[in-house]
């Protein structure tokens, strides 16, 4: 599973950390690989945003060792490329030259919300981002387990 947002410092690392936590709780760490990337290189090598780190710490979820990186062509090897908003989907498909690939999709299209995950870089609302990421990750994990029953 690869989570993608613009800078890879707010939304996608939050989703990555939440998904890792859910996978660990279920004893699936050796079965499901999780990472995140950004379509922009503006923050490459940086730790997650302070607001992301603080919200996850408050919820008992670690961001230790996480560093942002830009999307690369080898990321097409992931089975699920989960983008935080419609712009991320478009840019990811262009960058990976995978315009019709159904494994690249908008995160909340898995949920009843069917909307973009608002970027807390602009909104300042890390709580909303956290809640949407938890819902999306839980739904995505159930989908993965349904599609890969042998896990």
Residue ranges and their predicted role:
Residues 12, 85-86:
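Helix N-cap/beta->alpha junction signal
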Residues 3, 83-84:
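Short beta-strand scaffold positions
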Residues 1-78, 142-151:
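Conserved active-site segments centered on acidic
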Residues 80, 86-151:
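Phosphate-binding/catalytic loops
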């Amino acid at each position: 599973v690869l989570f993608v947002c613009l800078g890879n410092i707010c939304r996608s690392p939050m989703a990555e950390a939440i998904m890792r936590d859910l996978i660990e709780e279920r004893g699936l760490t050796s079965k499901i690989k999780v990472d995140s990337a950004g379509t922009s290189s503006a923050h490459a090598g940086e730790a997650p945003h302070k607001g992301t780190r603080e919200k996850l710490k408050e919820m008992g979820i670690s961001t230790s060792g996480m560093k942002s990186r830009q999307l690369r062509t080898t990321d097409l090897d992931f089975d699920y490329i989960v983008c935080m908003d419609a712009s991320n989907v478009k840019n990811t498909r262009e960058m990976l030259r995978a315009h019709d690939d159904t494994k690249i999709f908008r995160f909340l299209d898995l949920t009843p919300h069917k909307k973009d995950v608002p970027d807390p870089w602009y909104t300042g609302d890390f709580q909303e981002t956290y809640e949407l990421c938890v819902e999306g990750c839980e739904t995505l994990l159930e989908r993965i387990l349904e599609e890969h029953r042998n896990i």
